[in-house]
Amino acid sequence: MGSSEAETPAKANKASAPQEQQPPATSSTATPTVYPDWTSFQGYPPIPPHGFFPSPVVSNPQGHPYMWGPQPMMPPYGTPPYVIYPPGGIYAHPSMRPGAHPFAPYTMTSPNGNPDAAGTTITAATAGGETNGKSSEGKEKSPIKRSKGSLGSLNMITGKNCVEHGKTSGASANGTISQSGESGSESSSEGSEANSQNDSQHKESGQEQDGDVRSSQNGVSPSPSQAQLKQTLAIMQMPSSGPVPGPTTNLNIGMDYWANTASSSPALHGKVTPTAIPGAVAPTEPWMQDERELKRQKRKQSNRDSARRSRLRKQAECEELAQRAEVLKQENASLKDEVSRIRKEYDELLSKNSSLKDNVGDKQHKTDEAGLDNKLQHSGDDSQKDTN
């Protein structure tokens, strides 16, 4: 940060005059903690810290060479040595609070209710007649300029506001002050002194001009229009507008095309009336209700059709069974008639057979008797011949 002193141009004379009159005061920023026994944990020459993490105190955050040194091509045999960690961890600097740089993952709350990634508290600017933040010329937005100091110093981002007669603007987030002039930036040492003077003057004046000039977290002094954007707004749930309304349809479409129009069609029954339900939007469009009614009617019609088909199928089956029963009855009657006829014929045959048997028996008896008579006659004749 000391290299930025040589590259920044000189300040304006009008801007330096009020700075010299202000008495120095104690800075409100926290003093970084320096560990006195830091060298006892590290026996290696110090290396400049990484440029991404700026630090006002030159510290040696490097760890043990077994962690940061080059790895050998072949791992050594045996148990590797114990890795030594410096106090506070490798990446945690003792001189920086959580969220002390703009890209920190820790967010700190600011007075206006918005999370402040830089982790700093917004302070008021100089009080009294030196501050003219309410002037019309000071309402323009100031460009963000990055200081040309150290490589990773992101805390030196300062802003320039259009102020009349070389008067100072608000303090930046990291404790520096942007002043109006030719370049609009100054060195870090003079900025810290001006910050201490502004802090002491702010303590004396109180909070009378707290809302006049404020510095943002990136070092840009915002205009009143920007301050309005930082106000916390309540999140309101926007009601959904619903689907795009379409043409009104009903069940009579195509039925009364030549007789009635869509406006003269009868109203559908069973429409759902829109009710005030919290957290939901009632369907107030008529075409949505018509579509639901149409679907309901289609469902009912399909149910009726299926019931009618099943009823017709059962009726057809019953008719077929009745026809078959009639046919079977006729066949049964014809079979009964035939059986009765056959039985009559059988009876007739039995009677004829019995009559024939009787006739045959009579004739045979007569023949037997005639033959017996003949035998008797022959036997009588033979006996007479023998006696003679």
UniProtKB/Swiss-Prot annotation:
Residues 295-314 are annotated as: Basic motif. The keyword Cell membrane does not apply. Residues 1-46, 126-249, 261-316, 348-388 are annotated as: Disordered. It is found in: Nucleus. Residues 23-33, 180-193 have a biased composition (Low complexity). Residues 169-179, 214-231 have a biased composition (Polar residues). PROSITE patterns: BZIP, BZIP_BASIC. Residues 321-356 are annotated as: Leucine-zipper. Residues 293-356 form the bZIP domain. Residues 302-316, 359-369, 375-388 have a biased composition (Basic and acidic residues). One of its GO terms (molecular function) is transcription cis-regulatory region binding. Pfam families: bZIP_1, MFMR, MFMR_assoc. Keywords: DNA-binding, Nucleus, Plant defense, Stress response, Transcription, Transcription regulation. Probable transcription factor that may be involved in responses to fungal pathogen infection and abiotic stresses. Belongs to the bZIP family. This is bZIP transcription factor 1-B. It comes from Triticum aestivum. The gene is BZIP1-B.
